[in-house]
Structure formats: structure tokens, C-alpha cells
Regions:
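Blade-loop segments of beta-propeller domains
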Residues: 65-94, 121-122, 128-129
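Conserved long hydrophobic alpha-helices within structured protein cores
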Residues: 16, 54, 95-106
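Conserved beta-strand element within WD40/beta-propeller blades
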Residues: 45-49, 94-98, 144-148
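Conserved beta-strand position repeated once per blade in WD40 beta-propeller domains
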Residues: 83, 133, 175-176
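Acidic and/or Ser/Thr-rich intrinsically disordered tails and linkers
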Residues: 1-67
Length: 176
């Protein structure tokens, strides 16, 4: 008799409790390589399809429930959102990129959204075409990079919206 060991012997799961999400579907209507979903220890951000521009759904990670038909969204871009990234240093700091050519930083209230949010914490204008990708610096707190479809890479200081560096790329970037 031959016995085989499962390579999954230390993986455990638990069944969702009633009332928790049983499916989440994120759609990105943009031609981008960016993320439609990102998560921090406190929040889940999802690129939400709406008419008239990009919107972002924000959900508290410790308060799972079925999504109501109407709930508060981040509404600040005039075109589709192409990428979402939470800061690795501040759990409620979210960056969003858009086809409108902007990068916006959002400070989500600690108790989540209770009404639509339209005022960003910081706005970065510099790209001449849509912004495709974002990446927070992994070890420097207030630095973020953005790549646009015009083959340009910007490195920004989040605290004062200063351009730290601009690099013209020879080809389109697909990852930062």
C-alpha cells in the first residue's frame, strides 16, 4: 500500500459566516495594467464602475456585510480609474490613477466612508495622457511613482506634491 502526503497539509480554511461577502466582483473598464482592487489592514478599495467618471468603493475589512444597492463612494476622477494602491505606511491613505491624467491621494476617515468623498488630500498633475500604474516607495514614507501612457515616469513627494524626478521612458512600462 502506497501512501502519499498532501502538499497542502498545513492549509486551513473556514466557512464564511452568514452575512459575510460570498462573492466580490471587480471590473475595470479601462485598458490598463493597474489594479482594480487593493487592500490595507483596515480597508478594501475596489474600482467601481459608474457613469460619468471613475469611482472607488471603500469597505472596512473588519465589518463585512452584503453591499447595499447604494453606498458612499470616492468620486473624484473625471474618467475611469486605472490603478489603486494603499500606502504601506498609513492604512487609510489611498492613491488612485486615472485616464484623466491625474494621480490623487485620498485620506479615508478611520471609521470608513459615511457619505461620498470628492475632496482629495493631494492632486498630482504632470502626465499629458492617462496614468496607468502607481507604486508607493517600499521604504520611504511619502514617495510615490506613477507611469503614464505617454511613456513618462514621475516620482512625487506626497506631502507637498513636488516632482522629485521625471524620467522619459523608451517604451511603455507594464510594471513599476
Amino acid at each position: 500500500m502506497v501512501s502519499t502526503l498532501s502538499k497542502y497539509k498545513n492549509i486551513f480554511g473556514e466557512q464564511n459566516q452568514k452575512g459575510q461577502f460570498d462573492s466580490v466582483e471587480a471590473r475595470n473598464n479601462s485598458n490598463s495594467d493597474g489594479s482594480s482592487v487593493d487592500v490595507s489592514p483596515d480597508f478594501l478599495a475596489i474600482n467601481w464602475l459608474t457613469k460619468g467618471g471613475g469611482a472607488i468603493g471603500i469597505f472596512e475589512t473588519n465589518n463585512f456585510m452584503r453591499v447595499k444597492s447604494s453606498f458612499p463612494l470616492i468620486r473624484g476622477h473625471s474618467a475611469a480609474v486605472t490603478d489603486l494602491k494603499f500606502s504601506p505606511f498609513v492604512n487609510n491613505l489611498l492613491a488612485s490613477a486615472s485616464e484623466d491624467g491625474t494621480v490623487k491621494i485620498w485620506t479615508i476617515p478611520e471609521n470608513g466612508l459615511k457619505e461620498d468623498m470628492t475632496g482629495e488630500t493631494q492632486l498630482f498633475n504632470g502626465h499629458t495622457k492617462k496614468v496607468s500604474l502607481l507604486a508607493f516607495h517600499p521604504s520611504v514614507r511619502d514617495v510615490i511613482a506613477s507611469v503614464g501612457s505617454a511613456q513618462d515616469l514621475f516620482v512625487w513627494n506626497i506631502t507637498n506634491s513636488e516632482v522629485l524626478s521625471k524620467i522619459n521612458l523608451n517604451e511603455q512600462a507594464y510594471n513599476i
